[in-house]
């Protein structure tokens, strides 16, 4: 009897976390099925230490998230942005057999010695072909500019709307950050009939903490499965801080390129920069055509100081504004000011 009581006590007191799908997520990847592993305990999100973390644990996680088969166990520190210092490591180790339906069914060990340098990561095959990489995965449509409008997400090269059920200012903050549009503006505005979407409603019950880098990092209800109507489409308004200038040249149409973000001017790294990007800048400034300056000419304006805001900018050349081009997250780069972009336009 004593042995039976001890066994029952051990089972009932084994540490665990929420078994619902919203209690587990992957953060920082190109889609919702890869990234740093985070779990929820008592309403707080935290990371999992990689002690003993292996492909069997990832297999269970991928199954729980509906992300197909496990494809890898990358380190969690590879994903940006990194876990915040105040965010706790909640689980020391997870030990799954690989047959469980959720991580909550696996053996877990409470944290005693682990830092964010040891955060676990996971990569799944993701048969749903989730969101495209940032910034193409989300947009604000039918609004007065790039930073106001109906929220739409991209799935398999089609745009779909998002139901406002479960939507919050925290989710709006994520969208505005993802689009490089500054802070989210608190608004009670809803889509009018003219701004209703016509595509299927893809997401509902968004549950963002506000710290996510992209909307696809936020837990949500099942994709494509909801009871919403288009009069419940989500509308978001952000500050629109995007502006650019050329400094250090003889006129307003030549110089080192700087962009305005969050009220601060910063430079742009020249990784992948070329003639198409020059064309968009000249077009936006009303400065005629790009003169495609030589490497030497580009360097004559000197390095900037302060922030480097953009890196890996990619334009097709058809954009009307640099904000419509693809780029890394604002502020993320591997550059120095010796790589600052300079542009010379015909004027």
From Swiss-Prot:
Q: Pinpoint the SRCR domain residues.
A: 24-125, 138-239, 244-346
Q: In which tissues is it expressed?
A: Expressed in spleen, lymph node, thymus, bone marrow, and fetal liver, but not in non-lymphoid tissues.
Cell compartment(s), UniProt: Secreted; Cytoplasm
Which cysteine pairs make disulfide bonds?
A: 33-67, 49-114, 62-124, 96-106, 163-228, 176-238, 208-218, 253-287, 269-335, 282-345, 315-325
Summarize the PTM comment. Answer: Not N-glycosylated. Probably not O-glycosylated.
Q: What is its main location?
A: secreted
Tell me which InterPro entries the record gives: SRCR (IPR001190), SRCR-like_dom_sf (IPR036772)
Which positions carry the signal peptide feature in this UniProt record? 1-19
Keyword Cytoplasm attributed: yes
Superkingdom is Eukaryota
- Descriptive protein name: CD5 antigen-like
What is the protein's species of origin?
Answer: Homo sapiens
The gene name on file is: CD5L
């Amino acid at each position: 009897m004593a042995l039976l009581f001890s066994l029952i006590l051990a089972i009932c007191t084994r540490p665990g976390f929420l078994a619902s799908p919203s209690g587990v997520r992957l953060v920082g990847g190109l889609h919702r099925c890869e990234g740093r592993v985070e779990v929820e305990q008592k309403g707080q999100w935290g990371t999992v230490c990689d002690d003993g973390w292996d492909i069997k644990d990832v297999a269970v996680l991928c199954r729980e998230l509906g992300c197909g088969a496990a494809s890898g166990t990358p380190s969690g520190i590879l994903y940006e942005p990194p876990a915040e210092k105040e965010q706790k490591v909640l689980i020391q180790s997870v030990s799954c057999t690989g047959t469980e339906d959720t991580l909550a069914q696996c053996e877990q060990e409470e944290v005693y010695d682990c830092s964010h340098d040891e955060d676990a990561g996971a990569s799944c095959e993701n048969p749903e072909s989730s969101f495209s990489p940032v910034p193409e995965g989300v947009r604000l449509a039918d609004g007065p500019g790039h930073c106001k409008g109906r929220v739409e997400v991209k799935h398999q090269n089609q745009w779909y709307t998002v139901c406002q059920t479960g939507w919050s200012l925290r989710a709006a903050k994520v969208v505005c950050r993802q689009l490089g549009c500054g802070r989210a503006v608190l608004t009670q505005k809803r889509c009018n009939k003219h701004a209703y979407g016509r595509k299927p409603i893809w997401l509902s019950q968004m549950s963002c903490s506000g710290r996510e880098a992209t909307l696809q990092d936020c837990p949500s209800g099942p994709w494509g499965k909801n009871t919403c109507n288009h009069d419940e489409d989500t509308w978001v308004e952000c500050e629109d801080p995007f502006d650019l200038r050329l400094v250090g040249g003889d006129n307003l149409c030549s110089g080192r390129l700087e962009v305005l973000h969050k009220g601060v001017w910063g430079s742009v790294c020249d990784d992948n920069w070329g003639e198409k990007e020059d064309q968009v800048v000249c077009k936006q400034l009303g400065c005629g055509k790009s003169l495609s300056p030589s490497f030497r000419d580009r360097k004559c304006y000197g390095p900037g100081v302060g922030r480097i805001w953009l890196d890996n900018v990619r334009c097709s050349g058809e954009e009307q504004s640099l904000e419509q081009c693809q780029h890394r997250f604002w502020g993320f780069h591997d550059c120095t000011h010796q790589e600052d972009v300079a542009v010379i336009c015909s004027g």
